[in-house]
């Protein structure tokens, strides 16, 4: 029975929830490596069923982790605001605990307006604003209203009656601190709702059009007050008084003359035939260059009738067949190895004898 190599065993389903995303991806790569080894899977008794199951579970776990991370990224700003609110509420609770654990002398003094309990609440609010790091005008107004209500409450109670025991003195700061915590939490909720309502979604084209309009207005205002730059003045002067362009130097071109141009303009006024223009162009080419076309060896193309074209084709075909016959005879003679030599039936001796005899005759004639 074959066993999986070390490190490639499929993980139990309960272990996948405790694994991180990096570990899950590493395990998925290992399972893919095992699935690619077809020979190894064929040797297994279950034909790799467990490996396929673990592969599917790993894929599902990775998809779930990615979905959770994506949702957490979407709700990240909301969670930050919630954490800040929880931190503020915790600071208020700490302030209440300190107020409860304080001495009865401080509790009785809290009944007088502007006492230490109210100061403690103010200090907790200031520390809370510093921890948030972004105080706003609305938050300051709400906190001032809360302080006003807290200060007003004990003053009215002092005018009506004074508590006879320390129980009443403990009851009032608790009530004030709890109302303070509720007011601060409601103020944070209102701030959060206001900020969400201020968020608007606008099209990119509208934003660009607004930016362009603002830039145009700014440029119009600035152009009315500022003077034109120097380079704009130079460009306007150059447009009014343009500089004549110089002709580029070209090879094999006669130098430009004003008289020639004027005479050419005068001549161009009169109509010129196509043959005259062609002759002038040819003469101009002969003047500026020494390269000329060679004379034609054959006559230019002509339009022929059908009968003449048929006769020319037949003649061309006959010439072609004759040429093919000559080539075939030459090749056949080369294959048969036929050699043409001079035929002499008397042989070389007869020729020599005749030559010698002729010489003797010449000698005899010379003797006489």
Curated annotation (Swiss-Prot):
Keywords from the UniProt entry: Coiled coil, DNA-directed RNA polymerase, Nucleus, Phosphoprotein, Transcription
Family membership: Belongs to the GRINL1 family.
Modified residues (Phosphoserine): 270
Signal sequence, start to end: none
Coiled-coil residues: 301-335
Region (Interaction with Pol II): 227-298, 315-340
PTM notes: Dephosphorylated at Ser-270 by the PNUTS-PP1 complex, promoting RNA polymerase II transcription pause-release.
Domain of life where this protein originates: Eukaryota
Other comments on record: The adjacent MYZAP and POLR2M genes are part of a complex transcription unit. The respective transcripts derive from different promoters and are alternatively spliced. In human, some transcripts of the upstream promoter of MYZAP use exons of the downstream POLR2M gene.
Name by which UniProt lists this protein: DNA-directed RNA polymerase II subunit GRINL1A
GO biological process: maintenance of ER location; transcription elongation by RNA polymerase II
Keyword Transcription among record annotations: yes
Region feature (Important for transcription repressor activity): 29-68, 299-314
Reported impact of residue 33 to D: Markedly reduces the interaction with Pol II
Tissue-specificity statement: Detected in adult an fetal brain. Detected in heart, kidney, skeletal muscle, small intestine, lung, prostate and testis.
Region (Disordered): 116-186, 203-227, 255-282, 339-368
Organism: Homo sapiens
Pfam name, any one: GCOM2
GO cellular component, one term: I band
One GO MF term attached to the UniProt entry: transcription elongation factor activity
Biased composition annotated in UniProt, kind: Polar residues: 116-131, 205-224, 258-273
């Amino acid at each position: 029975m074959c066993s999986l190599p070390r490190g490639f065993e499929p993980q139990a389903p309960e272990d996948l929830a405790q694994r991180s995303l990096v570990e899950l991806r590493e395990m998925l790569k290992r399972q893919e490596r095992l699935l690619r080894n077809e020979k190894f899977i064929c040797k297994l008794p279950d034909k790799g069923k467990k490996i396929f199951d673990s592969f599917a579970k790993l894929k599902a776990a990775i998809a779930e982790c990615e979905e959770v991370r994506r949702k957490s990224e979407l709700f990240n700003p909301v969670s930050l605001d919630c954490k800040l609110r929880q931190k503020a509420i915790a600071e208020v609770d700490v302030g209440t605990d300190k107020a409860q654990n304080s001495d009865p002398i401080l509790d009785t003094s809290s009944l007088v307006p502007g006492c230490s309990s109210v100061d403690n609440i103010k200090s907790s609010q200031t520390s809370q604003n510093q921890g948030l790091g972004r105080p706003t005008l609305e938050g300051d107004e709400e906190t001032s209203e809360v302080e006003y209500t807290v200060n007003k409450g004990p003053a009215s109670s002092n005018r009506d009656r004074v508590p006879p025991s320390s129980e009443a003195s403990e009851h009032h700061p608790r009530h004030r601190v709890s109302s303070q915590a509720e007011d601060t939490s409601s103020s944070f909720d209102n701030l959060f709702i206001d900020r969400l309502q201020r968020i608007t979604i606008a099209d990119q084209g509208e934003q660009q059009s607004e930016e362009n309009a603002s830039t145009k207005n700014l440029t119009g205002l600035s152009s009315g007050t500022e003077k034109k730059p120097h380079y704009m003045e130079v460009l306007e002067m150059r447009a009014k008084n343009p500089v004549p362009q110089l002709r580029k130097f070209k090879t094999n071109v006669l130098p430009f003359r004003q008289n020639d141009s004027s005479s050419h303009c005068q001549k161009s006024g009169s109509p010129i035939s196509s043959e005259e223009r062609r002759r002038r162009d040819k003469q101009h080419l002969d003047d500026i260059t020494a390269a000329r076309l060679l004379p034609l060896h054959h006559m230019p193309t002509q339009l022929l009738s059908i009968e003449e074209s048929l006769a020319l084709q037949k003649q061309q075909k006959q010439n072609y067949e004759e040429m093919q016959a000559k080539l075939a005879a030459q090749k056949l003679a080369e294959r048969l190895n036929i050699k043409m030599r001079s035929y002499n039936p008397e042989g070389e001796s007869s020729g020599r004898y005749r030559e010698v005899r002729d010489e003797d005759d010449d000698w005899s004639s010379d003797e006489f």
